Design a protein with these regions (language model features):
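Membrane-topology segments of multi-pass transport proteins
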Residues: 1-81, 105-106, 110-129
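Membrane-interfacial helix termini and adjacent extracytoplasmic/periplasmic loops
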Residues: 98-101, 105-136, 191-228
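Amphipathic cytosolic juxtamembrane alpha-helices at the membrane-cytosol interface
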Residues: 169-177, 246-247, 251-278
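Interhelical loop and adjacent transmembrane-helix boundary motif
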Residues: 207-210, 294-345
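Transmembrane alpha-helices
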Residues: 237, 242, 260-298
């Protein structure tokens, strides 16, 4: 109730001070002093909501006072937002890099890169028992699941995008795009539940029908689930890429007697190919960073295998596993999560950089 009373009073006082300044040509610093005094009186009012509103009003009134310098204020605000984002990213990168150095001081880089097991053999380094931290099984598992997911999502996404952009009516396009937006908002844990309860059982029944042996937690289940999950994402990207092709090129080629299918194959796809490739690379980055579906559908067993019917694990799953529970921050297991984060960061950064390079070539 006090907040409801104080806020309108503050607004009235601010307006009166503003009019008083304009009429009597009072210096701006006197006006600002009054605004600051009112604001910080409300800060000590011991009400977070009133404090937030009063500070927001302060910045609004500052912008109103310096309306002749509004462009400079907006430019400065945008620069501050950019600087905050940059330094947050830089801080994350530095923290990961520093903790990774601490890990490699305890575990040799050669073991990390070339050991074929993860967490199986127990060795002793500096009188401390730790596991064998070889990233090879994690890289193979990540690569295997990514390949399966992209084999599913690229053909379905490309054909769906072509139909939506070239053949579907406006009503159908609106319904499909709305549905894709809804599907994109579904949490990944729902797709993980779908993979465990339905997809895993279905694939196991199909494999048994053909006489194949398959684990209940397999890379095939995880790859298919992630492919289904990112399908709305890649369809939207590919549709935008196809619709960006100028209509003059299409109509000019069709005026020469080409069919719509020939126009798509010879004009639309080649012209939009750089954007299509960048969309695929961005989708790969999202597949590599997925954690929940893989954790629910595959598990944490780090097996070095290229068989999609066997159980594998990924880099993100091991990061989540190593940081789960009560862990010593300086333990080798915790530091291993930072080393894996560094590898994951480098991989995704290279993919995104290559995607931007492909788009610039367009």
């Amino acid at each position: 109730m006090n907040s409801v009373i104080v806020i309108p009073v503050l607004l009235i006082l601010l307006f009166c001070f503003s009019r008083f300044q304009e009429v009597n040509k009072v210096k701006s610093y006197l006006y600002l002093s009054c605004v600051w005094m009112l604001t910080w009186l409300l800060v000590f009012y011991n009400n977070c909501f009133v404090t937030f509103i009063s500070i927001a009003l302060l910045f609004f009134m500052l912008a109103f006072i310096f309306k002749n310098k509004r462009n400079k204020i907006i430019k400065l605000s945008l620069f501050v937002a950019l600087a905050i984002s940059f330094f947050i990213t830089l801080f994350i990168m530095l923290s990961i890099f520093i903790q990774s150095i601490s890990f490699f001081n305890k575990v040799a880089i050669s073991e990390f890169l070339f050991c074929l097991k993860w967490g199986h053999n127990v060795v002793t380094i500096n009188e401390e028992k730790i596991g064998c931290f070889g990233i090879a099984p994690l890289l193979v598992g990540t690569l295997l699941i990514t390949i399966i997911a992209m084999l599913v999502v690229v053909p379905l996404g490309l054909f769906s995008a072509i139909y939506i952009s070239e053949y579907a009516s406006e009503k159908v396009r609106y319904i499909v795009n709305t549905t894709l937006q809804v599907l994109s908002a579904i949490p990944t844990v729902v797709y993980g539940y779908f993979a465990v309860v339905f997809l895993s059982v279905f694939i196991k029944q199909v494999a048994n029908f053909f006489g194949l042996s398959i684990h209940s937690e397999s890379a095939l289940v995880a790859g298919l689930s992630i492919g289904i999950m990112i399908l709305p994402f890649i369809i939207s990207l590919l549709e935008d890429a196809i619709r960006s092709v100028p209509k003059s090129l299409r109509y000019g080629f069709m005026a020469l007697g080409a069919t719509p299918a020939e126009t798509i194959w010879h004009i639309t796809i080649p012209y939009a190919m750089p954007t299509i490739l960048s969309a695929i690379l961005l989708s790969i980055s999202r597949v590599i960073g997925e954690t929940m579906i893989v954790l629910m559908a595959v598990g944490i067993n780090a097996n070095l295998t290229f068989n999609p019917l066997n159980s594998v694990t990924t880099i993100t799953v091991q990061i989540a596993t190593l940081l789960t529970g009560d862990q010593d921050f300086n333990s080798v297991q915790t530091l291993a999560a930072y080393a894996l984060s560094l590898v994951l960061f480098i991989i995704t950064w290279l993919l995104n950089a290559f995607a931007l390079f492909v788009m610039k070539r367009n």
